[in-house]
């Protein structure tokens, strides 16, 4: 049985080819034809401060369970698919624990993981160590790759990633800032986590590209997530006459910073934050503080794509979510759905 499981794991990565900038996985036919079915593990934050990232996951998994009810075609044969979902609780330690449970206890054949390096990285590391193929998303590729001590000359053997990079978000932020008259002085809010360390990195993050475009970046240093006092950062920004604030913070920290900035009389012309402002609920929680803020948009109902699984357009997928949940669409819907598109496409293109 262990031999069969290893064969199935190894099979999943043998015929890799690029899909949307990420390596897709290939699976030999005979391994699954003889198997009782495929187990897919899915890890994301359902609770804790990162929970908004996982808000749409139950909806997407319900869609997939319905779609997979009769199995999927692999080489003309129907193969049963089971999805086992786990909550990272917004904790890197917990993410690693549930990944190991899925690998060692549930015996999953393929792992899918989404939402921030604090989730994707420990799950990917567990899969790399245990030789389980893994596809991850919703974390810029730099903190996922270099945050795991990746070597560009070697890459990884079992773990694959689909998402944009810091070069993309920096270019978009800069384009927006150039449209507003400012003194080009930028204050950075970079926490001591995978995203913050990558975004603030002098070689791979914001400092270099901003300097090349004539912007100066003041980085007052790292802080812990769930910070309750941003007085030091606000004082530094005021002293340096900062007119643009950027960074990558969790929703609770954005609210704390914006509240304290208002209380302390700091009024930047532009506030562009990654991560914290992606979700309708997070903006609603800010009240009037949410007016005039900006952030990146990496999926929306207006994106011109159609699902390879359900044939829904992005607009139809968003409408389906809103109808089922009575909540406004949220960006991670598209990438949670895309994880399953890549997984199924790879499985359907298997070879003996």
Model regions: which residues?
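Extracellular/periplasmic bilobal clamshell ligand-binding domains
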Residues: 230, 241, 341-352
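N-terminal secretory signal peptides and thylakoid transit peptides that target proteins
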Residues: 1-20, 27
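Beta-alpha junction/loop-to-helix N-cap segments that form part of ligand/metal-binding clefts
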Residues: 52-59, 71-147, 223-230, 255
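Extracytoplasmic ligand/sensor domains, especially the bilobed periplasmic-binding protein
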Residues: 108-221, 271-295
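Extracellular/periplasmic periplasmic-binding protein-like sensory domains
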Residues: 141, 261-337, 349-350
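C-terminal segment of N-terminal export signals and the immediately downstream linker at the start
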Residues: 4, 27-45
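Extracytoplasmic "Venus flytrap"
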Residues: 41-64, 86-92, 115-116, 189-201, ...
